Amino acid sequence: MRSFITALPFLALLVDARKCGNEVVPPSVQMAARYFDRQDKLADARTLQAVAERSLVIDTYFHVISSDNTLKGGNLPDEQVTAQFNALNRDFKDTGISFVLKDVTRTVNKEWATFSVDNDSKDVEYTMKKALRQGSYAALNVYYRPLGDGLLGICVFPEDVTQGDRTFVLDGCQVLTGSVPGGDTTNYNDGKTATHEIGHWLGLFHTFQGGCAGGDGVDDTPAQRSPTNGCPTTNPDTCTGPQYPGVDPIHNFMDYSYDICMYEFSLGQTKRVFDFWDRYRAPHIGGPEPTVTRSSTTTTTTTTTTTTTPVITTTPVITTTSTTTKSTTTKATTTKTTTTKSPTPTPSPSIPDWWCDLFGICRSA
């Protein structure tokens, strides 16, 4: 539903239900969403048809962070990594978005695997992501680890960044290891958590955000009073009255239903994704990639880097290319490897008309 509120902390309050934890939506993102909302009102059928026919391929990096080399400790076998990757492409297929798995890293680091997602742990999160993150701001980095606090995942929204700054480093999604296909999280183990979180990474809000008086800022998702728990046999209608047409979108990936219940994004959500992509992430395509530093500070650290053959429509081939193990019984060990890619210069983009309308910063006459 089209509507906005001023603060959007994506933290579920339900017990024994899907829990997604997110940062408050930055004011600049809310402002951009309002602008996109105004533009949507002017969109005609041809504009929406153009959105439906558009396509996008996103470079993707998976990082598996575990306490030890066991499945219980958070280490995922290649088969489940492949299944999760294929689930993402299946879930986003109707939006025209596909993912290319560029690299899979595996890191054994108990502190990184178990830290809580809160403001007090930002330094640990920053250290982990600075060591593992790859690609430009247009590249998706997903960190699979045994999240605590009952959370299934957490992801950040797109916003203005400078290559390599703190906001750039903290970009990406953290997803509960047990939520991958075949994982041990009952009702949430078909890979849909990653789909939901990546929806946030692409600019989408929860369908129930703000209740009946709030909304996700997308016109074709009906108003919803509260998140869905489970998978109802019929769609409830929690926001009644002529001003709230439609029933709750319980099958939408941005609700909180069981994985088995989720299977769609709306056309309006697809348009919003491309709006945010063009505004925030597309300008970074082809730009210089940051220096990638691999480091760890636990008493026993194993880092395995694997590469994948980019495959979109078929099962990706995962091939291990290097394994590095450092251990000691007397003191912490720090391992660092630095890889620098030659920057590719890109011309500075011109200031678009919508930027002038939105922020009042315009071209010189």
Residue ranges and their predicted role:
Residues 16-138, 145-148, 290-308, 313-314, ...:
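Propeptide-to-catalytic entry region of secreted or membrane-anchored zinc metalloproteases
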Residues 69-77, 183-188, 260-261:
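Second-shell loop/turn segments in exported
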Residues 163, 221-297, 360:
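Metalloprotease/metallohydrolase-associated module, dominated by Zn2+-dependent proteases
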Residues 82-230:
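Metzincin-family zinc-dependent endopeptidase catalytic domain
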Residues 1-19, 364-365:
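Fungal secretory targeting signals
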Residues 289-365:
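Fungal extracellular serine/threonine-rich, low-complexity, intrinsically disordered "mucin-like" regions
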